[in-house]
């Protein structure tokens, strides 16, 4: 009986660890609410190209393209200090970036559900460059 109880405890610990390593999804509404509340434990990371970022991005987001994230990861600050919400245009590059971040030890990771396409389609706030004369 003791060995069964021990097995259940060990299995629970393993499952909990496995779940903690997988990034959670965050809905656009939930991200908006956290941003509006001034949440200082939040970092929004846009992993699209610089050209895409310059065309429009989520307010307060920082841009590190997914293909150079490994080289520039120190720009995100100490591992584990903030929740990192990652997005790209539609999801593929964000998944690659999330794997890079997990490999670097980040564990407070979130993937924006629907990425930038959904965010902008829902009419949420977007920073766009001012029109040039």
Name the predicted role of every residue range:
Residues 46:
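Phosphate-rich cofactor/ligand-interacting catalytic cores and adjacent structured alpha/beta frameworks
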Residues 87:
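Short, surface-exposed ligand- or partner-binding patches at beta-edge/loop junctions that are enriched
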